[in-house]
Amino acid sequence: MIKIAIDVMGGDFAPLEIVKGTLLALNKNKEIHVVLYGNQKLITPLIEKTPFFGNNQITIKHTPYFLRSADKNIRDQLKATPNASLFLALEAAKQDEVQGVVSAGATQTLVLASHLILKKMPLMQRIAIAPMFNSFDNRTRILLDAGANTELKPQHLHTFANYATIIAKEILEIPNPQIKLLNIGTEPTKGRALELETYQLLSQDSNLNFGGNEEPQNLLTTSADILLSDGFTANIALKTYEGTMLNFMNHFKTILTKNLIKKMATKTLFQKPLQQLKNQLDPRQIGGAMLLGLNKIVIKAHGSSQAYAFCQAILQAQKLIKAQVNQKIAHSLESAKNKETQSKQASTKNTAPKTSETTKESQQSL
């Protein structure tokens, strides 16, 4: 049984949609046990009126405290309200009471709280936000870093690329995932110093399937399985994608239901295709974004997540835990560190002066 902590009080539609989504996930997967952190007086009635028969899969940890999105100074909040639902969920993961955490709370709040409580994995220099998104070709892609770091070094992006490659192999079941660098042009000479140096690092790594640069207009049609950039750039790309998809679908629906005749025709002819299109492109359908680089699996569900989207986020966490992604990442980082150490030692050995041979030659000449 995989135990996952749920921040029931985080999100725009908490606790109703969070509880409904959790129960939906438990009905879909009997391997999950959830620990719900939040106000029991609100949680229990929601569980009781929702069809559900696996109560042995639920534990409720009562707390009346939760974090509001306006709360900015996490260190102060952690001292003032250590029993807030999010903090308790993360603390449970730290103490190995659960194997992962899912929250729809504010992104920066979750990132900072996770960093303070769970800490980064050994050898991991930065945390990254890595959402998945769908496209017209029914492929799921990974975008990172989508907002954890506005400024990064090439070495950080290189590490993220290796991390995302393992996730694409284990979760998306892509044997040899391709990585591309989000940039303003496809030529290797395009971009800032960050992109230029990262391009060189990725090109030289034989363990990565690097496909070069990718322009933003190809976000939905790229051959890449993983798109890489700093948190500022990737976050803008992600929000542009999300806003475009939601507005497109809403506007398209408005056109097709503008009058009674169109509404009847749409219901008769286009209802099923429209639902398929929504499932294909709606960013809320995919689940959540992974917080990469932490000692435990943490999933950031969309702030506006309703039941189905939150359910997907929980199932996503379960897959990552079951696949032992963190353990494989730790092994990959350790192997890379060992190779780097061996390379430096070999380089030092080759450049060291051959003292004994030099002395012998000097004595012979005398």
Swiss-Prot record:
InterPro entries (alphabetical): FA_synthesis, Phospholipid_synth_PlsX-like
Region feature (Disordered): 334-366
Pfam name, any one: FA_synthesis
Record keywords, A-Z: Cytoplasm, Lipid biosynthesis, Lipid metabolism, Phospholipid biosynthesis, Phospholipid metabolism, Transferase
Compartment(s): Cytoplasm
EC code: 2.3.1.274
SUPFAM superfamilies with a match to the protein in the record: Isocitrate/Isopropylmalate dehydrogenase-like
GO molecular function: phosphate:acyl-[acyl carrier protein] acyltransferase activity
KW Ligase (keyword) present: no
Assembly behavior: Homodimer. Probably interacts with PlsY.
HAMAP family in the cross-refs: PlsX
Name listed for the protein in its UniProt record: Phosphate acyltransferase
Organism: Onion yellows phytoplasma (strain OY-M)
